[in-house]
Every structure is written in C-alpha cells, then in structure tokens.
C-alpha cells in the first residue's frame, strides 16, 4: 500500500514506512 499523505489516519496503517509516511504528511501540511 502506498501511503496517502492527504489522509492522516492512513499513514498509521503503513507498517514499513510509518516514519516516512508521517514525515510526508507533515511536509504536505506545512
């Protein structure tokens, strides 16, 4: 599954790239 940086709940479901998904989410939220 690809992490959707537009959905804050979705990055939590990313098992391998949790930190990466979180960073992408934060960057898109800047």
Curated annotation (Swiss-Prot):
Indicate the principal place this protein occupies in or around the cell.
Answer: secreted
Q: List the record's Gene Ontology CC terms alphabetically.
A: extracellular region; membrane; other organism cell membrane
GO BP field: killing of cells of another organism
**InterPro entries with a match to the protein in the record:** Cytotoxin_Cobra, Snake_toxin-like_sf
The family line of this record is: Belongs to the three-finger toxin family. Short-chain subfamily. Type IA cytotoxin sub-subfamily.
Query: Whom does it interact with, and what assembly results?
Result: Monomer.
UniProt protein name: Cytotoxin najalgesin
